[in-house]
């Protein structure tokens, strides 16, 4: 009967000690998995961010090409006063000093070439 008790006690002690080791091992394993999961989430987040930045960069590039400053400025029509230093007459027109009409208002007008 004593041998049965000793054997049972020995099995009990081994089970408890190995169980504790397994518990610590499981805890360490879970910590490693969570750290790997965090690094995986960081990697996935960076990958998604890169994928989203590519179309955004293309859209911003298109917007910069079509800015308001790049469009053609409006031109001045025939018989309209113009500035001698900055003539913005339409194509086919020249900024000239008027002959008789308009000499009292402004010194230069857009005329046909």
From Swiss-Prot:
<feature type="propeptide">
    <location>
        <begin position="22"/>
        <end position="74"/>
    </location>
</feature>
<keyword id="KW-0800">Toxin</keyword>
<dbReference type="GO" id="GO:0005576">
    <property type="term" value="C:extracellular region"/>
</dbReference>
<feature type="region of interest" description="Disordered">
    <location>
        <begin position="58"/>
        <end position="83"/>
    </location>
</feature>
<protein>
    <recommendedName>
        <fullName>U11-theraphotoxin-Hhn1a</fullName>
    </recommendedName>
</protein>
<keyword id="KW-0960">Knottin</keyword>
<keyword id="KW-0964">Secreted</keyword>
<feature type="signal peptide">
    <location>
        <begin position="1"/>
        <end position="21"/>
    </location>
</feature>
<comment type="function">
    <text>Probable ion channel inhibitor.</text>
</comment>
<feature type="compositionally biased region" description="Basic and acidic residues">
    <location>
        <begin position="58"/>
        <end position="69"/>
    </location>
</feature>
<dbReference type="GO" id="GO:0019871">
    <property type="term" value="F:sodium channel inhibitor activity"/>
</dbReference>
<feature type="disulfide bond">
    <location>
        <begin position="75"/>
        <end position="90"/>
    </location>
</feature>
<comment type="similarity">
    <text>Belongs to the neurotoxin 14 (magi-1) family. 01 (HNTX-16) subfamily.</text>
</comment>
<dbReference type="GO" id="GO:0090729">
    <property type="term" value="F:toxin activity"/>
</dbReference>
<dbReference type="Pfam" id="PF08092">
    <property type="entry name" value="Toxin_22"/>
</dbReference>
<keyword id="KW-1015">Disulfide bond</keyword>
<feature type="disulfide bond">
    <location>
        <begin position="82"/>
        <end position="95"/>
    </location>
</feature>
<keyword id="KW-0872">Ion channel impairing toxin</keyword>
<dbReference type="InterPro" id="IPR012627">
    <property type="entry name" value="Toxin_22"/>
</dbReference>
<feature type="disulfide bond">
    <location>
        <begin position="89"/>
        <end position="110"/>
    </location>
</feature>
<keyword id="KW-0732">Signal</keyword>
